[in-house]
């Protein structure tokens, strides 16, 4: 019992640090799409999911929770994201031998296509340009005991703007600890620790004249423009989740995450999930507490679970997220567990 108290004290201290005012670091990293919440269930709970990761969303929030459920999970998520962009996330966890799990995930943000225009051809050249972000991950998780689990992921990250691309490699690590007190779970993860991004491509090659006033020299030297390199957005999460009501057929779980990003100020996310007969789910939360001028806020969602016989069941989830001055976000997913 004493060791549980120590864990609780640490969680409370870490959560309280998020109330401190910090200097904004917005715009100091690349690949900001890595900060988009994955999965309607987690998003509906305000993103407070590092200690709640009992489905494929563990691949995003806390790979240390991958093996804890003892099941295999698949999720496909689609979101009409901000300013006509499209966000898709796919995650699959395969349970191996009960205490081990391997997983893969794909994250994609599609900015769409536009006409290429120039000063002399303002109506378009006939070409089209596009921009897309992509992240691929391979993960492994293990239950070291019946109450303590660890996991990690290796990632490949790419950003593309027309003919230019930037690539990086990163890793995630996480852990999950289960207590005896109301099924309290404590989670922690560090994500996107890796190399920097630097744009490269054929459009960076330019023909220049080093001395326009001189004669008799090569006036079309090929030079390459050098672009700045940008670090990845590193996230440190620590969270707690607890079942405050667990009396069949009702269950109510509350959760909170403290998040320290390297590209913004610290925040706290809170959320809750109410379930009836483990079939119908109502969720609500609030994102980005204590962050000044944040556009994120209230989140809410519903979900249903459909059993197909045996241990197989399907899940359908919908989430609404308030985004302030921007359009409200609506997320959908389809999942299966076996």
Where do the PLM segments sit?
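Bacterial N-terminal signal peptides
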Residues: 8-17
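Bacterial N-terminal signal peptides that target proteins for export
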Residues: 1-8
């Amino acid at each position: 019992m004493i060791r549980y108290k120590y864990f609780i004290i640490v969680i409370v201290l870490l959560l309280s640090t998020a109330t401190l005012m910090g200097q904004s670091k917005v715009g100091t990293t690349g690949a900001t799409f890595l900060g988009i919440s994955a999965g309607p269930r987690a998003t509906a709970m305000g993103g407070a999911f590092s200690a709640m990761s009992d489905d494929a969303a563990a691949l995003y929030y806390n790979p240390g929770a991958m093996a804890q459920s003892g099941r295999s999970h698949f999720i496909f998520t689609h979101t009409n994201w901000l300013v006509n962009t499209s966000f898709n996330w796919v995650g699959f966890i395969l349970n191996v031998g009960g205490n081990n799990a391997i997983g893969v995930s794909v994250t994609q943000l599609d900015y769409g296509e536009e006409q290429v225009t120039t000063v002399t051809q303002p109506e378009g050249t006939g070409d089209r340009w596009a921009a897309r972000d992509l992240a691929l991950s391979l993960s492994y998780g293990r239950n070291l005991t019946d109450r303590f689990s660890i996991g990690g992921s290796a990632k490949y990250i790419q950003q593309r703007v027309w003919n230019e691309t930037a690539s990086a490699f990163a890793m995630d690590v996480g852990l999950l600890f289960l207590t005896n007190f109301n099924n309290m779970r404590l989670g922690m993860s560090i994500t996107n620790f890796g190399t920097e991004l630097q744009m490269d491509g054929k459009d960076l090659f330019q023909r220049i004249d080093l001395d326009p006033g001189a004669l008799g020299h090569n006036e079309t030297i090929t030079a390459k423009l050098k672009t700045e390199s940008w670090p990845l957005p590193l996230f440190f999460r620590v969270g707690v989740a607890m079942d405050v009501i667990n009396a069949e057929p009702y269950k109510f779980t509350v959760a909170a995450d403290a998040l320290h990003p390297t590209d913004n100020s610290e925040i706290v996310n809170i959320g809750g999930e109410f379930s009836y007969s483990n079939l119908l789910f109502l969720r609500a939360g609030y994102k980005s507490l204590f962050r000044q001028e944040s556009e994120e806020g209230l989140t809410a969602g519903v979900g249903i679970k459909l059993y197909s016989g045996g241990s197989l069941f399907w899940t359908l989830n919908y989430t609404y997220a308030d985004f302030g001055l921007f359009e409200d976000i609506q997320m959908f997913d389809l999942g299966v567990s076996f």
